[in-house]
């Protein structure tokens, strides 16, 4: 079962939408987040479409890749390129289902997405690609370093009760 990578610009194609939504839900549940206590945010098809509209309305170009194995979505990644400030591009989510990890799918997705990004005329003035990775997520930190990301800062996330 060799995964196939599909890349596109903009909203998720209808034929891939259900798989994209399932993976987004799994990511919020499965990715190491240290001691944060926030609960998973379900991402159904409607939530995915709302998020896409919001990002596009804010001026972002969505650069996306999805890995499929036997027609099942097994991984995805997303880059956000701002039409208003294209100098710093944001590498957003990258996620691979646990059963498919360790096969280079995350790397293949990120590289396919970077190629797609570089094909956009809007990326001509882009200088940096920025991402955030939780320190307990050692595999993603390792992948990001392997493809050229360098640590620029450490972000500390604090949470507390309201009220």
Predicted regions and their residues:
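Conserved acetyl-CoA-binding loop-helix of GNAT-fold acetyltransferases
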Residues: 96, 102-117, 142, 146
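Conserved beta-strand-loop-alpha-helix junction that forms the acyl-donor binding cleft
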Residues: 97-101, 126-141, 159-162
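Conserved active-site alpha-helix within GNAT-family acetyltransferase domains
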Residues: 107, 125, 133-153
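A conserved beta-strand-loop-helix scaffold within acyl/acetyltransferase catalytic domains
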Residues: 28-88, 92-98
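Conserved GNAT acetyl-CoA-binding A-motif
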Residues: 88, 117-133
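Conserved N-terminal entry element of GNAT/NAT acetyltransferase domains
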Residues: 1-18, 33-35
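Hydrophobic alpha-helical core bundles mediating ligand binding, dimerization, or RNAP-core interactions
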Residues: 17, 21-24, 51-52, 110
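C-terminal "cap" of GNAT-fold acetyltransferases
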Residues: 1-8, 147-163
